[in-house]
Amino acid sequence: MNSQPQARSPFFQRPQIQPPRAAIPNSSPSIRPGVQTPTAVYQANQHIMMVNHLPMPYPVTQGHQYCIPQYRHSGPPYVGPPQQYPVQPPGPGPFYPGPGPGDFANAYGTPFYPSQPVYQSAPIIVPTQQQPPPAKREKKTIRIRDPNQGGKDITEEIMSGGGSRNPTPPIGRPASTPTPPQQLPSQVPEHSPVVYGTVESAHLAASTPVTAASDQKQEEKPKPDPVFQSPSTVLRLVLSGEKKEQAGQMPETAAGEPTPEPPRTSSPTSLPPLARSSLPSPMSAALSSQPLFTAEDKCELPSSKEEDAPPVPSPTSCTAASGPSLTDNSDICKKPCSVAPHDSQLISSTILINEMNGVGEKLSAKENTVGMLRQEVLPLTLELEILEHPQEELKVECTPTPIAPSMLPAFSPAPPTPPTSPPCPPVVLSAAIARSPAVATEVQRVADEGESLRTCLSKDAKEMQDKAESESDGQAEETADPQSLHSGRSPAPVQTATTAPKSWKKTKEQTRTPDEVLEAEAEPKAEEELAVDSVLEPEQEKMSQGFPSERDPSALKRGKAEEGNGEEAEPVRNGAESASEGEGGDGNSGSADSSADGLTFPFKAESWKPADTEGKKQYDREFLLDIQFMPACIQKPEGLPPISDVVLDKINQPRLSMRTLDPRILPRGPDFTPAFADFPRQTPGGRGVPLLNVGPRRSQPGQRREPRKIITVSVKEDVHLRKAENAWKPSQKRDSHADDPESIKTQELFRKVRSILNKLTPQMFNQLMKQVSALTVDTEERLKGVIDLVFEKAIDEPSFSVAYANMCRCLVTLKVPMADKPGNTVNFRKLLLNRCQKEFEKDKADDDVFEKKQKELEAASAPEERTRLHDELEEAKDKARRRSIGNIKFIGELFKLKMLTEAIMHDCVVKLLKNHDEESLECLCRLLTTIGKDLDFEKAKPRMDQYFNQMEKIVKERKTSSRIRFMLQDVIDLRLCNWVSRRADQGPKTIEQIHKEAKIEEQEEQRKVQQLMTKEKRRPGVQRVDEGGWNTVQGAKNSRVLDPSKFLKITKPTIDEKIQLVPKAQLGSWGKGSSGGAKASESDALRSSASSLNRFSPLQPPAPSGSPSATPLEFDSRRALTSRGSMGREKSDKPIPAGTARPNTFLRGSSKDLLDNQSQEEQRREMLETVKQLTGGLDAERASTEADRSKTRELAKSEMCAVPAPDKPALSEEEVERKSKSIIDEFLHINDFKEATQCIEELSAQGPLHVFVKVGVEFTLERSQITRDHMGHLLYQLVQSEKLSKQDFFKGFSETLELADDMAIDIPHIWLYLAELVTPMLKEGGISMRELIVEFSKPLLPVGRAGVLLSEILHLLCRQMSHKKVGALWREADLSWKDFLPEGEDVHHFLLEQKLDFTESEGPCSSEALSKKELSAEELSQRLEKLIMEEKADDERIFDWVEANLDESQMSSPTFLRALMTAVCKAAIIADCSTFRVDTAVIKQRVPILLKYLDSDTEKELQALYALQASIVKLDQPANLLRMFFDCLYDEEVISEDAFYKWESSKDPAEQAGKGVALKSVTAFFTWLREAEEESEDN
């Protein structure tokens, strides 16, 4: 071989396939001729990773890879395609170039150290890139015979069974291919053969001749490989028996039949480092030409450290695999090894197949298998001739034919080192050869064949021989066995099946002694052998004996020197660095590159040898230290007593590496988890640190290593998740009754109802009710379903019960035919009440459930069970309580909407009051809070008194909880307060309410800020006399108590005790000068008045005695006006001179001021915070009685004659505006038109009322539609009662209309809102349409918006009146659209666009239209009878006719109601000869019409009964006819019980015709009615 040195690489290289080149025999085996650096050589900047001692199931050639049984990849590996470095063979090479281990990014993985084979756990390998099938090379064929089959030639079977770790077919791989899958014998890196103890000197390697064809030499001229040999160089020689099973049964392995792995050979063998020869052996040539495994046989097992295992196994690879010792590649002689088929027992095909399948098995099973195989299998022997020691009889054993890495997942071979020089076939020597003479013969034969090709050993080879002598014995067991096992099955290097990932490569730790490497690799082995049971223990013992007792330092130095020739620096493993650091002389001395290639453990002459089965076993200290991490040494045997002080559960955990890791290197997870997985067992070292360290660290004995679990993962195995029996599915995937369209429609209906209920709010109510009306509810099932949905929603959300009750009120007319009685119908109301009653009476069933649960709780003994049952019981009770309260609240709201009668409600109250349990009493409180005001009228007061007496008794007995007692007391207090709650019901709010509250809160905050600012500054104009000792004390609610003694000018000797110097005394009381204030009589009259916010009014200068302000009442009339927050106080603090610019503000008044004062007291009762600011908010003022107010009014009237009327308003516009806001705010809360009218009447004397109109419009413009409607009605009543003039009305609106166009930016619907404020005025006729429209159009014509407002007004009128009537009003007003639209706009187009064409349609004159509408009772009856009886018009048509021909007043008139009832009754009467009966179907059909116009009004219902009575009288009162009508009308809930009773007791003379006979005919009906009512009361 050429001695040309190669570029030194600081890292170990993996074995690779080098292009064959002409090799010149040379004494320097580490130097090879060639222009290119071997592709497998890693660059200096790449890191080497030592795999942890974890039983990782994958070798790391390219990062994390899985070797999964039955998993055959044809795609790229998990980690990604490796980058290939082109390798151009200098000579003709039939092999295709491919990626080598050095071609892959270092982040994916680093080479392994082959110092010692690591027993790999089940490797999960993801195949690397496919390699093109290499062309066959002519090589010398080696015939292999199987002694177990009578010497049968199994060479062809072995050759055809070669496999590759790559997904490509295992055809011979090109020499130039740098990928790991297969190694040619000449390309095998200097795999240090493991020499067994039979030979103490390890010179075999040096003397082994290597023969090879010349072309192969030329092809295989790889540069010197790293010192560490890849175990992948295991000889891939399989004997006949094995070959057959490999070829035939490897497909079965793919089928997933896991079988135990072949155990390592029982006899320890050690391979001495062989001097590398430039000439490969003929056997290697032959082997390299043929793959050992077929594609089926491959268990893609790419080693993450070695990527260049040649597809064609060679003797060299076998030996190297069997002995992945750390011998220097330079020391290895590339000598061919002949394999004698009969020399060793072949692993049975079943075992091999099972090994292939066992990749995914757990480590324990695999290692058990390994133990068995060791005992069963004779190693395949190769006879090699050692030039150096020819006299020594060496028995070469290629341990049981190399098994594919997939077959040996339990073994983690030592990390491979890429070859840089043609590897020499390692020789496995074992005592097993001695047991088989055939083996010896075959070995001799092979050696003879190689004589012609022998070359002199190079200097390096000799050095390696010396080195191997000292190391071969000890390493034989560790390296030869697993490597041989690995090499047999697959050309993939055995190290591919390494267990734990070796630690990452670190540039700092490039100097590692062979001892460290051996220790580091022994540790993973030991870790993996933990799972091996007693079967392996004898073998472990032998292995422990095979470790070297001493090392040859010269060999180490030679190995280090060898590394200089392109070898990679030894990777540093976590935990192994302790060896290098602790043994500094060993690890850190010499060159930076420490060689461990050929490291073996030689036995001393006096020590026991594995071949000596009877000898005494003796070991020295160093030898024992080397085996301290072997499986037998670190795993706790089963059955030991748990004595923590004597028996350790785990070995000491080595200290983690503190050196910075390469950020490109990903952490390796436990077991089979890939690098990118999330590791639950992260080491304390943090991210990026391998879980457990490989290298032993004797410097930290206190640390222990956790035993790991090997988890088998199978990618192809289908994981079946447990499926829930009643798993939720989307509606589209559910097994619905697809064949039943009715069921589908029903479910769709329920879905829509749920959607509407979820969106139901007071603001969205009208919108959603239209959607509900459009739903089709035509069966009893659907109706019940809808009722259940509404009811459940109502009781679940009591705060929204008002909205749900209103929804039910709108659906009360809904009727559907009964399912069991086709002729009968059932209505919504009846089913709803039944549902409520069922829920109301459910307490008995609930009690039974609670009692049962209570018994279970008492019977339970376990505390956990008792706790669980107790929680369940409490939860059930709480749920039942919430449902009961929700049901009661809902029932109360239904009663308030007249859907339930008083009798039913009294029945509920009595029932709840009888039960003294807390739940019933709580429901009672909720019910009375809801409906107490409606039940507590004059007629029912005696019953209510009984209820409350009983409640007071319950409170006094104190037998219930305090919570319930307080609730009862609250209801009692509520009744005493006339059912006016202290706080408003916290129900759902509209957006307007929320905005309003936020605005009020903001105003309150501003007011507080202003008050604080005012306190800080001096008020100008106020003379402060510090010497006077003014003492101002802050009182509650901003009231200030002034010390009278400080008022120096108050000199009246006798002051009435009732004179109030507190804020109630104001300007008026001091108007008489310094007389001392009001008299006692006056103060009595003024006691009810509120205090002024101007609390410094006593400091005002005295007014002239003759001025109008001298009246003692005048101050009270202005009490709410002198202070407007802090500003008011500032103004009132100023002295008011006689010639002030605004003397009337405080110095003028009238008796109307006093009346206004009293109205303000009433407003304060329920005023919001803004009102409190004006009135001072004193509780004493709120407690003023009506008697005081009436007394004050009388006093004011008596003074009116003495007080002249003011010439000007007493209040400024700003003050009127503030007061108007308070009046409007109170009115909108209590809707008391009478009170509001009185306040406005009083305000009109003090200021312009157009300000009130303007404030009313602005105040309600952005609030709810109901608010605007109420405001519009208030304005109409004020105009109608002439309290508000039309001029003020128009003027108040004009200011807003002028700005409306600009306001439309912020209020887009401003035109609709303005129309809602005006519509009531037009509807009720307060102002004529012409006058109103003309006035409103004036400010809008310049901006062209008059038409838009008129359009909104007319549309709103059409909703409340018919289009026909609105059109008539328009035409009657003689209005033309041209006057209100901008010039040039098409009137016709505008009317069509706004749908106002009805205003222009021709029709009869308004007088004719009005005269037609004024129909007599006879005409109404005729037309209605024609529609109902003759034309049988539907309800909508009747509604349209009534709307078109009658106005609202006529619709509610007795004439129309009687005519309608008469027509319906006539249509329902069926005459059979002389008998009459009622067709209930007709009545039921016309129930919507009757309900709409009777509107649940008792008076209207009474008129309908009068009409029915008259119709019966006309028919001469047929027997039972009236009773049948009464029954039907009652059942259909058209007529209420109150109306029936009222008709019965009616004494109206006009309705007495036939009344006696009629009463007699319905006596039974009334008797039944009363009995039913009494029954409900008793219940």
Swiss-Prot record:
Cleavable signal peptide: none
Record region (eIF3/EIF4A-binding): 694-1014
Residue ranges, compositional bias (Polar residues): 26-35, 315-326, 481-501
Any GO CC annotation of this UniProt entry: synapse
PROSITE patterns linked: MI (PS51366), W2 (PS51363)
EIF4A-binding: region residues: 1427-1579
Sequence ranges assigned to domain W2 in this UniProt record: 1410-1579
Region (EIF4E-binding): 614-625
Domain MIF4G, residue spans: 750-978
Pfam families: MA3, MIF4G, W2
Subunit-structure text: Interacts with EIF4A, EIF4E, eIF3 and PABPC1. Part of a complex with EIF4E. eIF4F is a multi-subunit complex, the composition of which varies with external and internal environmental conditions. It is composed of at least EIF4A, EIF4E and EIF4G1/EIF4G3. EIF4G1/EIF4G3 interacts through its C-terminus with the serine/threonine kinases MKNK1, and with MKNK2. Appears to act as a scaffold protein, holding these enzymes in place to phosphorylate eIF4E.
Protein name as annotated: Eukaryotic translation initiation factor 4 gamma 3
Originating species: Mus musculus (Mouse)
Gene: Eif4g3
